């Protein structure tokens, strides 16, 4: 697991999975939304990951997060699953 922290306002966690990488979590406090913190953390993670395919799961109803991922080159691949934590529907985004 690899952890990135964003000035006590956010964090990103990623891990290598076979020949790709998974962004396991990306969170920021609402006060930091729109400040570029999420962009900076995601770009740093992608730089660390290098030239490998990357995937992540997002809550289907979280349109703000989905727009963020799409803005950064991720595309929904059509995969869906039910979250183990709260039963919410998640969709998979991929890049590369």
Cite the ranges covered by each PLM segment:
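Acetyl-CoA-dependent GNAT
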Residues: 1-33, 39-48
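Accessory recognition modules or surfaces
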Residues: 35, 39, 88-96
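Conserved GNAT acetyl-CoA-binding A-motif
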Residues: 48-60
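Conserved catalytic-core motifs of GNAT/GCN5-like acyltransferases
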Residues: 55-58, 75-91
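Conserved active-site tyrosine of GNAT-family acetyltransferases
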Residues: 69, 74
